[in-house]
Amino acid sequence: MTTRKKVLIGVVIAVAAVAVLRVLATLGLIGIMFIGSATAKPEVHEDIENYTEYMSFSYDSSDTKWSKWGMDESIWPLKINDVSAVADYKMVYYDPWDAQFLGYLVMDYSPEDYAAEAARLKDYPSTDYIGYYSVTEEQTYELLAVYADEYNGFVYALTDGNNRIIYAEEIFCNYCMDLNYKEYIPEDYLLDGFDASSDNPYRKKMMNESDR
């Protein structure tokens, strides 16, 4: 065998080895992601006495699992002054490979406290929200305040007009939630039309636009 042929064979072997390593690395990454998704379990918190521990505004540093992708949670109460006014509460954290959050707080206020809180929320500089994740104009409840991000989701407050305020949030990335969110929140607490499932139309639209 000539030296030239030996060199050529060596190059072919090297290229093949690199290709195999790339395939193995890709398969390894897919395997890690699959294992992460399969083994990660949602953290479900219903302990209202620890309410502030699960809110981003309780931390000075963004280096915390409760940073919530920088979303503004100031729509929610800074603290719970009257635990007896809490009708329902849940905060869910799930991180198979990217952190996502789902929460709701239902408060039954006195007429005086309701009026004050509703006024605070109506003064909040609400953002546009219609069209993100197929959300339509809210009709189920009156929308008092909303902070919406076209990528990271929603933080908002709703009212039934009878001294009850429902604070809720769905915070995530990559245009979908891996969490089966309908298992953890009453559907009427979601904004009308909300769809963050893995094959939601909004995700398809945004991914197509990013590929152009």
Cite the ranges covered by each PLM segment.
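N-terminal export/targeting and maturation segments
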Residues: 26-113
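Intrinsically disordered, low-complexity regulatory segments
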Residues: 9-12, 26-36, 191-194
